[in-house]
């Protein structure tokens, strides 16, 4: 029998998801009588390969196989498979074998599948079809019989290995739906030792545990007499679940699964399952790194189902121009009475939806614990009814012009002073919209002002008894301050929100007020109730609703993910100006009521874009969201939206397929840094081969309003030439890829593969083999979801026409049709623009790359040519404009390195740079003489690294910080900057040093974001290990980018030895961390000693070159970074 592929990573992935993973022969050997042979002499090679490559996976909780199986065949293979598929469809089970099959219904009739009575096939399933017609599977049926094969197909999961390292799933629940069992934690390999830093061997730096502060450790010791890390003492009786405590008459608001004992701590922490031996990195004292104890519940509309994390995305982009609380706001909808307090308690803690006025309500008994809470929550409702929200808003977030009249700038910053009749200051009539726009853009409230407003509201609203103590109030307000200072994609973890909150101070949590001894289960119950109250007040019910009611919160184009808070009265004026400017630049036609009605009734449904604006330094950028259906108040989760979005993704995949098959369609378009590197390297080597090297002329052109200016008729002609709707038919396969990362995490990706009948791979084995040959697919499991073998080009082209000609934009309650350009919020926008400009280049600039190079990143052109007349003609053509393609140069962003005659381009002239300079283009700096490339860091000036860098802190923030830093480092180590055939050694030294210096800024930003006030001095070895891993990772990427070159040798010699990379890394981190010596004093000594040790190892010439690359004058851009 042939040997099975090893596929170690795939086998390890499956073992982490199933109870048992066995070869097919081993599994069957356990069922059959001794001596029964599955593979016999003379069996076909296909059957031998099937037995060798098939893995049987037994799910957790699967029904056991028949006790005495009958190895007799009764049915043919097609009949047996059909019978299994019908049973799966009747059970409603998700099984790969039944993908593409469904039960017949009245609306969707048709003949049933052969050998079934009520199953139809609506999409081809190539895995099932291959199995039904396979001779090898037929022979397997004859050897094992109906009972055993039915059990394998219906109750187990089968995988077939595909050499060299992948597999695909044949049957069973799809692998991407399975979660790892809690009893089998995924192993995480330790951090390897790295030479170069003293005291950072495998033992010193391998632990990434950010230990708790001494104060928290001492408080934990005071809480319990046992050892700090031990579990709760075993109870004499089996501990009851939370649902079985005395309040069992109420709904189970916090159901708990059976879990091992967890340690009890004085801080509020979610009770979660954790292995006593499992360690975590960066967590607070006394917490565990898994999910909260409660499960999602069917709560009311105003309260989210999963209150685990307050997230900043919940208060972004809230429309509306009035600064007021909506009547549907939960606290406003309830009267300040005991009955209203009861409803509020039920809504917060028991997941009950508030009843509409007049609706019949079935009263139920409220548990005693919650009954005693009513007076406090009645006081809260009364405080809310009396709270002067508008006055507090005017006091703490005054409009800047009005605040300047009443007090100093410091008072305005602190939120001092009252503006009783506050209105945004109107600009004089003679001021233009642009001037007024800039003034209004500056009238955003600082996070401190917003926090002062929220603090005043919370102090007015929440009774003292609910806080329990001033300590708890200060802790919660500190978390509110941190919450509004987070970036766009950040969230505040439940552990942070409840850290150091004292349960014993909150008497309203007590189930039995007279009890002097609190059992561990009761203490955890109190923790959960307080945690739920804090999460809902901070993240869902109150703080987020206040922000949504009084502010428009958005990110900007110039401050990365940092959030800006505009009062709605200011934002409404900004939005009005933005809409007027949009009408001036984009051709929109308003729809009549009849047209709107026709679009709503159209079949298939049409997407409608919602417009929002993104602030720029001196303007607004329109952004559209295409996740809406015309006439339906539904978001992207709606089935209609999902179907239309799926069609758009299919169209996108088809266009990409044609682009890959015919690269000339894109012209000079570059799809990323890798494409730029390949094109630039080819050009550089060609120029350097000439002797003497010619003088080169550079032209950079940015197109004005590229997406909005594309003529739709021309775009339709271009796409018709790409798709060829009357000729083309495509085969589209939807599949999922599941892989296991080096750290034990499972990564899932859902993809589409497009082909034609000429290059179709109909069988999954061939398809997986092709993926491994043509892509970087390794150590993965592939699951086919569906396959369409007849995607007509005409239907895809018709979808494209609907997208272009029927794009509806909702602006201010009215609907408009976009008559020019393409929607910017679509996944197709960039590709359509590139295809259109590629067609323009073929028509207008043939042969322009004969001696030079033309590059374009979407709408940013770069021409480098040795011919001055060619450069002038190219510049003149784009400045004059190409109306057939809507292409016109923006002279403010156009630059050349040669003189332009006065009047040659009209009244305006582009930026003229010296003949020899660092020429900027798309974040790159190109040396016009040597053609070496470095990165342009000017975009980081006056920005906050903290605002642009967020990492999922989760249960292991230390490990997540390290993973995030290394992931960003890999992105920045582009081949264009590290290629020694393009750049000289000094330029590569300088590029590597700047990468390390920016990484040091990121390191500092991450340390500032670590939760629980974790000081660096508590675990310096971990942070030193992160710095050492930074140098190691960058040097590995440097070697990969220069494969075939010998970079280093013994004795720190060679072109670029590893010691040089570590020296640059240490120098960069010392430069940054020395400015924060109070935080990093424990690291500076080790870093300085390691740098001195490397300085003694490096040759003098290499050391002098490194010091020149690290000259402070070369890193002036970094001095203006805000962090």
UniProtKB/Swiss-Prot annotation:
Residues 381-401 are annotated as: CP motif. Residues 231-308 are annotated as: Linker. The modification Phosphotyrosine is found at residue 697. Its main location: nucleus. A motif (TFLY) lies at residues 312-317. One of its GO terms (molecular function) is telomeric DNA binding. The modification Phosphoserine is found at residues 227, 446. GO terms for cellular component: chromosome, telomeric region; cytoplasm; nucleolus; PML body; telomerase catalytic core complex; telomerase holoenzyme complex. This is Telomerase reverse transcriptase. It comes from Canis lupus familiaris (Dog).
């Amino acid at each position: 029998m042939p040997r099975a592929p090893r596929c170690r990573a795939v086998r390890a992935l499956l073992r982490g998801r199933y109870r048992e993973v066995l070869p097919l022969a081993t599994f069957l050997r356990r069922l059959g009588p001794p001596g029964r042979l599955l593979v016999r002499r003379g069996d076909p090679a296909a059957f031998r390969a099937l037995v060798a490559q098939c893995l049987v996976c037994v799910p957790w909780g699967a029904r056991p196989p028949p006790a005495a199986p009958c190895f007799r065949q009764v049915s043919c293979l097609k009949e047996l498979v059909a019978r299994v598929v019908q049973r799966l469809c009747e059970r409603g089970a998700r099984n790969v074998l039944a993908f593409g099959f469904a039960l017949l219904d009245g609306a969707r009739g048709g003949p049933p599948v052969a050998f079934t009575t009520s199953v139809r096939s609506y999409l081809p399933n190539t895995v099932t079809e291959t199995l039904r017609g396979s001779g090898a599977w037929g022979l397997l049926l004859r050897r094992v019989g109906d009972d055993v094969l039915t059990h394998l197909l219906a109750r187990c999961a089968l995988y077939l290995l595909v050499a060299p390292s992948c597999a695909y799933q044949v049957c069973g629940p799809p692998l991407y739906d399975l979660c790892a069992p809690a009893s089998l934690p995924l192993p995480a390999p330790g951090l390897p030792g790295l030479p170069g830093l003293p005291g950072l061997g495998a033992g010193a730096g391998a632990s990434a545990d950010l230990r708790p502060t001494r104060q928290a450790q001492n408080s934990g010791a005071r809480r319990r007499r046992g050892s700090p890390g031990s579990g709760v003492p075993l109870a004499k009786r089996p501990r009851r679940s939370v649902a079985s405590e005395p309040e069992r008459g109420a709904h189970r608001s916090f159901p708990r699964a059976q879990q091992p004992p967890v340690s009890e701590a004085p801080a509020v922490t979610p009770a979660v399952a954790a292995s006593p031996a499992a360690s975590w990195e960066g967590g607070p004292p006394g917490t565990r790194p898994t999910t909260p104890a409660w499960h999602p519940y069917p709560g009311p509309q105003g309260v989210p189902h999963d209150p685990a994390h307050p997230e900043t995305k919940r208060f972004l982009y809230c429309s509306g121009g009035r600064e007021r609380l909506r009547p549907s706001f939960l606290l406003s909808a309830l009267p300040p009475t005991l009955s209203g307090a009861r409803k509020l308690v039920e809504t917060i803690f028991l997941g009950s939806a508030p009843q509409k006025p007049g609706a019949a309500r079935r009263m139920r008994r409220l548990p005693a614990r919650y009954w005693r809470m009513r007076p406090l929550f009645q006081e809260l409702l009364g405080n809310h009814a009396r709270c002067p929200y508008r006055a507090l808003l005017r006091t703490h977030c005054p409009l800047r012009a009005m605040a300047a009249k009443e007090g100093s700038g410091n008072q305005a910053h602190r939120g001092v002073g009252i503006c009783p009749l506050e209105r945004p200051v109107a600009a004089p009539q003679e001021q233009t919209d642009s001037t007024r726009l800039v003034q209004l853009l500056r009238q955003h409230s600082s996070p401190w002002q917003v926090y002062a407003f929220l603090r005043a509201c919370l102090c007015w609203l929440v009774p003292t008894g609910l806080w329990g103590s001033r300590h708890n109030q200060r802790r919660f307000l500190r978390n509110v301050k941190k919450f509004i200072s987070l970036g766009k994609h950040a969230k505040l973890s439940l552990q942070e929100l409840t850290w150091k909150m004292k349960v014993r101070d909150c008497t309203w949590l007590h189930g039995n007020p007279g009890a002097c001894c609190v059992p561990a289960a009761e203490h955890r119950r109190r923790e959960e109730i307080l945690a739920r109250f804090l999460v809902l007040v901070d993240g869902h019910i109150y703080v987020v609703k206040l922000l949504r009611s009084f502010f428009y919160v958005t990110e900007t184009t110039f401050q990365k993910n940092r959030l800006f808070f505009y009062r709605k009265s200011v934002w409404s004026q900004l939005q009005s100006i933005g809409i007027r400017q949009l009408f001036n630049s984009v051709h929109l036609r308003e729809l009549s009521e009849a047209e709107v009605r026709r679009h709503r009734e159209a079949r298939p449904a049409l997407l409608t874009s919602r417009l929002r604006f993104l602030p720029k330094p001196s303007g607004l950028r329109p952004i559209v969201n295409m996740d809406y259906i015309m006439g339906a108040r539904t978001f992207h989760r709606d089935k209609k939206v999902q179907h239309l979005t799926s069609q758009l993704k299919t169209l996108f995949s088809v266009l990409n397929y044609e682009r890959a098959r015919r690269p000339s369609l894109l012209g000079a378009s570059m799809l990323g840094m890798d494409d730029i590197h390949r094109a630039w390297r080819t050009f550089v080597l060609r120029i350097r081969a000439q002797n003497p090297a010619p003088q080169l002329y550079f032209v950079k052109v940015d197109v004005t309003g590229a997406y909005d200016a594309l003529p739709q008729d021309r775009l339709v002609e271009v796409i018709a030439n790409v798709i060829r709707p009357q000729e083309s038919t495509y085969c589209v396969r939807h599949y999922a890829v599941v892989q296991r990362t080096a750290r034990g995490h499972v990564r899932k990706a859902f993809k589409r593969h497009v082909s034609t009948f000429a290059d179709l791979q109909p069988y999954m084995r061939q398809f997986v083999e092709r993926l491994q040959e043509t892509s970087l697919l390794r150590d993965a499991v592939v699951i086919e979801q569906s396959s369409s073998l007849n995607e007509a080009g005409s239907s895809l082209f018709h979808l494209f026409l609907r997208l272009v000609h029927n794009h509806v934009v909702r602006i201010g309650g009215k609907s408009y049709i976009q008559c020019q350009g393409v929607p910017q919020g679509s996944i197709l926008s960039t590709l359509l623009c590139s295809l259109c400009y590629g067609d323009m280049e073929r028509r207008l600039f043939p042969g322009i790359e004969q001696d030079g190079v033309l590059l374009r990143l979407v709408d940013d052109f770069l021409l480098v040519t040795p011919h001055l007349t060619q450069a002038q003609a190219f510049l003149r053509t784009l400045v004059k404009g190409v109306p057939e393609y809507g292409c016109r140069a923006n002279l403010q962003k156009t630059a050349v390195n040669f003189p332009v005659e006065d009047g040659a381009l009209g009244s305006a002239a582009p930026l003229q740079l010296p003949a020899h300079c660092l020429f900027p283009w798309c974040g790159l700096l190109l040396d016009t003489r040597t053609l070496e490339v470095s990165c342009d860091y000017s975009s980081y000036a006056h920005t906050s690294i903290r605002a642009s860098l967020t990492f999922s802190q989760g249960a292991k923030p230390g490990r997540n910080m390290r993973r995030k830093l290394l992931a960003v480092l890999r992105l920045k180590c582009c081949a264009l900057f590290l290629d020694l055939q393009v750049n000289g050694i000094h330029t590569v030294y300088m590029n590597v040093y700047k990468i390390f210096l920016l990484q040091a800024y990121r390191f500092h930003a991450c340390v500032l974001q670590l939760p629980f006030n974790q000081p660096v001095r508590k675990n310096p070895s971990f942070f030193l290990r992160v710095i050492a891993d930074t140098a190691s990772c960058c040097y590995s990427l440097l070697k990969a980018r220069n494969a075939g070159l010998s970079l280093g040798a013994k004795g720190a010699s060679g072109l670029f030895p590893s010691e040089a990379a570590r020296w640059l890394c240490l120098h960069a981190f010392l430069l940054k961390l020395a400015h924060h010596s109070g935080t990093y004093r424990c690291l500076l000594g080790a870093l300085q000693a390691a740098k001195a040790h490397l300085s003694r190892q490096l040759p003098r010439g290499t050391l002098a070159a490194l010091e020149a690359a690290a000259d402070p004058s070369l890193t002036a851009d970094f001095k203006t970074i805000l962090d």
